[in-house]
A protein has these predicted regions:
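Enzymes and membrane/adaptor proteins characterized by extended Gly/Ser/Thr/Asp/Glu-rich
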Residues: 37-59, 63-157
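Phosphate/pyrophosphate-binding betaalpha-module
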Residues: 157, 162-171
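Short coil/turn connectors at secondary-structure junctions
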Residues: 15-16, 67-69, 123, 167-170
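DNA-contacting surface of Y-family translesion DNA polymerases
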Residues: 2-58, 80-82
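Short, structured coil/loop segments at alpha-helix boundaries
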Residues: 8, 29-30, 103, 139, ...
Length: 171
């Protein structure tokens, strides 16, 4: 059930429209469910929120009892940055590996399959891929999360990745 914040409370309403709060644990806390019911439009999930695909599906269903159109966001890049397989490591190649192979059809298919798995669990927004160009090989944050150092390669693979996610119904 969606109950928007009071019409006169524009600050709260505006905040609920743009924030994507996270939380600790594998079930949604009462404060989060209350805010989703009041109009919070999105929730961000991380590895600490996921024990298994089945548990994740139950969590997203729990959120949707308060608001059926809530965006459930996650950072699922494959490779070193995984949430679905956080306990054992990703079975999918990361962006740097995909860029090294430089096959956009493969990148699209990997992203489509990741998107399919996310959608099965009720996740409808992926914060991936990292569209950064790895212009500094010593950058500890981007590194293997980038498709590579070439701007055109990174652009091609970013577009293919987004197409794959969207084909699975994930933004």
């Amino acid at each position: 059930m969606t109950v928007l914040a009071h019409r006169t409370d524009t600050v709260t309403r505006d905040a609920l429209a743009v924030l994507q709060p996270g939380f600790e644990g594998t079930t949604a806390p009462a404060w989060l469910l209350r805010r989703v019911g009041e109009g919070l439009t999105a929730v961000g999930l991380f590895g600490r929120n996921i024990a298994s695909p089945e548990q994740l599906a139950a969590l997203t269903a729990q959120l949707r009892t308060e608001r059926d159109d809530v965006l459930v966001a996650i950072d699922e890049e494959g490779g070193d940055v995984t949430r679905l397989e956080v306990r054992g490591g990703s079975s999918f190649p990361g962006n740097l590996a995909l860029g090294a192979v430089d096959d956009t059809a493969l990148t699209r298919e990997v992203a489509r399959e990741l998107g399919r798995r996310l959608a099965e669990c009720g996740v409808n927004l992926n914060w991936a891929p990292s569209a950064d160009v790895n212009s500094n090989p010593d950058n500890p944050v981007i590194g293997v999360r980038s498709f590579g150092a070439d701007t055109h390669l990174a652009a091609r693979h970013t577009a293919a990745y987004v197409e794959g996610l969207q084909a699975a119904g994930v933004a």
